[in-house]
Amino acid sequence: MSSSGQNRNSGSGNPISNLSAGLKQVNLNDQQQNEVNLNLLQQQLQNETNNPKSQSRITHFFQNQPSEGYTLFSHRSAPNGFKVAIILSELNLNFNTIFLDFNNGEQRAPEFVTINPNARVPALIDHQNENTSIWESGAIILYLVSKYLKENGECPLWSDNLIEQSQIASWLFFQTSGHAPMIGQALHFRYFHSCSVPSAVERYTDEVRRVYGVLEMALAERREALIMDLDVDNAAAYSAGTTPLSQSRYFDYPVWLIGDRATVADLSFVPWNNVVDRIGINLKNEFPEVYKWTKHMMRRQAVIRALRGD
């Protein structure tokens, strides 16, 4: 088990430290949508249990689970797995990462399917809570921050206020339902589809740009409000339009989607923002507020550790 706030990973082959580089090697959609035969899986599980020589490392893990901390099941090219790792790292929680080998079908191992019937990553096991398993990145994140709040009375990435919780959750669900899937589809049709479908590439890339337009507007409004609040001496000139906001000393100051600090609403976007250049979107030129926001988050030590897979 790793020390507090750090991650010790387990995976086959040499680790890929850069998420974007990992995407070049593995198909995002190799998190297969295969039909699961539960009876067959149960039989396979029984056979492996009765034959120790044939046991995979996944079987071995489930038969020898740790008694504390968390285990995150991820993949070197899966942004959603890194998204969960960022939250675990930010909250300084003990966790171990197992990077599944899709080439060997580890995501379809019977034991893994028992904790994630969708046979995809990420999935998380909380060993201090009766080995509770959670799957889907949004559900995992909500579990982590809710538990942290309950145990500590406050959570730096969440809120104890119901209204603010709903606002944070709205952006989190926007990321999981609109942002990530559209980038994933754009990547698929650009690099991995069996034949060229320019209309699909265009459709999904345009939708990603629309999503970033929503973020850009929200962050720009936050930027304007912050400048008007802090740069009091020049507020009248900004309001009159005689002085552009870009001249304010607060123009590059960090702003967040909700409140005055980074929350899961912000951090959930980081891994996907880190690979969006691969579909031809230049955040710095096209969405400058999103770019600045992302760069501020990418400088956080917890984010750096998580994206490295440390």
Predicted regions and their residues:
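GST-like domain detector, emphasizing the conserved glutathione-binding G-site
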Residues: 2-14, 18, 22-200
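Residue-level recognition of oxygen-bearing side chains
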Residues: 139, 289, 302
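Residue-level signal for nonpolar/aromatic packing positions in well-ordered secondary structure
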Residues: 124, 140, 168, 215, ...
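Active-site-flanking alpha-helical
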Residues: 145, 272-273, 296, 307
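GST-like fold's C-terminal all-alpha helical module
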Residues: 172-295
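Proline- and acidic/polar-enriched loop/turn elements at helix boundaries
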Residues: 99-100, 288, 309-310
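C-terminal helix/juxtamembrane-tail motif
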Residues: 301-310
